[in-house]
């Protein structure tokens, strides 16, 4: 470590020991907090009263909180001074009410997810109030809380560099502490195919192993079996994390096309390309076999994941290098009366989205504007109204908000300038390569992300939420993934959960310190944001 980093880490420990402020570790900050008089004094004979069998996991998590903070785990029973309850009168699916008074602690929620989030908030209260926690006391408070946005996501990219199941579980453990409720898994790209498809085994036999010199499970090689993914889905669901699979088509498909060359455009059938490197190849829109294979893939993916959502890509398709040069695709274009090969995206996704709908899946696509030929003022093709779109291109989110509002599409915000966590966090920091001219996305820049874009509520009611994306070209293991995610992920968690009127950089900066210390204790790597310590307090 260099000297500024060492000093910052020492400061974390000092602040973690000295913290006295009752609310100093709440992150994301709750939307209604009422501090009250008095304290609840614990005894080692406390029990956790659980009012529903659905709350057993939340109760087990609360036992672990007490074990870590107070040194003992209360037994779970039908009643006690510590109570977890479902309350059907509460409105939001993730709403919770945490009440601490001299008589005890109660956590209520309409669903198990809300109660679970109440447990997490209680843990952060204890983390922030070190002096009272050490004496077995909890200050009185009432917190009524619910998220600003229902969709709060992070994205991992095991297609570029494979991440073992246990590593993904650890990532889920951390993200759920900050009330992210969705993990998107980018399971296919030019560099690898990472999900077992039994009807087309070559996808993994060939497409999951780009480096014959490396071991079967390595950053270059590997895939998830369907049973592994089902178990991962269950693990995540207990922690209120929905896993959305992404199969990226018709571009980003070198792994598919290496496994099944007959799916390429006709003029590329005999061409060679290097599997494992970004290659501007595409599935053919004119080949019926493409749609048969994709139908099988969508069916099997839908059977593995409990989510009724599937992300089907749709981004960065090099149409002019593929369909525009393909006799069969140009003939298809003419047969539909189209004047541009871009319009074949309507044909392609018309069939692919029909497969998703057939299997009861709601499709998500990256929002592509006609930005190959600037200005970017319209959709690349005609998105159906029942498709959710994700805005991602640098600087184009305001236009995407406008277009989706007009077209009636739901929109997820993942603007590159705020939420691309593969971008470096500081000058000369990771990733080591910057051959794309990646801009800096600092911690403060991410925190300044305002999902409302200062629009009136009626102009943004179609916005579902936010997503931080971690593209994997330079992410070779989970330690690097965590390093690039945190602390920016903490800033994004507040953008997705906390109302803008309650957000403050100065407040966040103070609440950041005990949470970084907690990440350190849990063995989660993160970048030390030493630069913010020079800011005026």
What residue spans do the PLM features occupy?
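Feature activates predominantly on carbohydrate-active enzymes
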Residues: 91-311, 355, 467-472
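Flexible, acidic glycine-rich loops studded with aromatic residues
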Residues: 363-370, 377-537
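Bacterial Sec-dependent N-terminal signal peptides
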Residues: 1-25
């Amino acid at each position: 470590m260099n000297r500024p980093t060492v000093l910052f880490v020492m400061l974390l420990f000092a602040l973690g020991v000295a913290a006295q402020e009752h609310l100093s570790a709440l992150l994301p900050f709750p939307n209604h907090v009422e501090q009250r008089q008095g304290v609840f004094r614990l005894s080692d004979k406390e029990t956790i009263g659980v009012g529903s069998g659905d709350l057993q996991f939340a109760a087990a998590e609360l036992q672990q909180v007490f074990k870590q903070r107070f040194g003992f785990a209360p037994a779970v029973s039908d009643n006690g001074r510590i109570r977890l309850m479902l309350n059907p009168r509460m409105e939001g699916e993730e709403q919770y009410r945490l009440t601490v008074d001299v008589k005890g602690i109660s956590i209520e929620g309409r669903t198990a997810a809300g109660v679970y989030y109440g447990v997490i908030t209680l843990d952060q209260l204890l983390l922030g109030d070190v002096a009272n926690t050490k004496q077995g006391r909890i200050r009185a408070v009432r917190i009524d809380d619910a998220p600003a946005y229902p969709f709060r996501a992070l994205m991992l990219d095991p297609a570029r560099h494979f991440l073992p199941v246990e590593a993904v579980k650890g990532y889920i453990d951390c993200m759920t502490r900050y009330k992210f409720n969705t993990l998107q898994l980018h399971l296919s790209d030019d560099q690898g195919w990472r999900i077992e498809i039994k009807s087309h085994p070559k996808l993994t036999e060939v497409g999951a192993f780009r480096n014959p010199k490396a071991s079967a499970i390595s950053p270059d090689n590997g895939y998830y079996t369907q049973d592994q993914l089902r178990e991962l889905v269950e693990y995540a669901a207990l922690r209120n994390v929905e896993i959305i699979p992404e199969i990226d088509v018709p571009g980003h498909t070198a792994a598919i096309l290496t496994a099944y060359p007959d799916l390429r455009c006709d003029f590329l059938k005999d061409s060679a390309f290097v599997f494992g490197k970004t290659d501007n190849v595409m599935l053919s829109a004119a080949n019926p076999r493409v749609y048969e294979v994709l139908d099988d893939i969508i069916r099997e993916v839908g059977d593995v994941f409990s989510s009724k959502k599937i992300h089907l890509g749709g981004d960065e398709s090099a149409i002019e290098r593929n369909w525009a040069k393909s006799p069969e695709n140009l003939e298809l274009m003419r047969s539909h009366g189209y004047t541009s090969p871009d319009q074949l995206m309507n044909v392609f996704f018309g069939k692919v989205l029909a497969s998703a709908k057939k299997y009861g899946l709601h499709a998500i696509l990256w929002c592509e504007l006609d930005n190959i030929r600037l200005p970017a003022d319209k959709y690349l093709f005609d998105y159906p109204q029942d498709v959710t779109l994700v805005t991602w291109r640098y600087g184009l989110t305001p236009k995407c908000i406008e277009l989706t509002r007009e077209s009636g599409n739901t929109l997820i915000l993942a603007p590159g300038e705020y939420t691309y966590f593969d971008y470096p966090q500081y000058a000369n920091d990771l990733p080591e390569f910057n051959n794309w001219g990646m801009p800096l996305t600092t911690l403060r820049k991410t925190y300044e992300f305002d999902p409302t874009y200062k629009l009136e509520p009626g102009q943004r009611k179609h916005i579902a939420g936010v997503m931080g994306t971690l593209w994997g070209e330079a992410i070779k293991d989970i330690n690097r993934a965590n390093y690039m995610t945190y602390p920016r992920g903490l800033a994004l968690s507040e953008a997705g959960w906390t109302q803008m009127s309650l957000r403050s950089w100065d407040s966040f900066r103070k609440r950041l310190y005990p949470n970084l210390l907690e990440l350190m204790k849990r063995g989660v790597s993160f970048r030390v944001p030493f630069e913010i310590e020079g800011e005026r307090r």
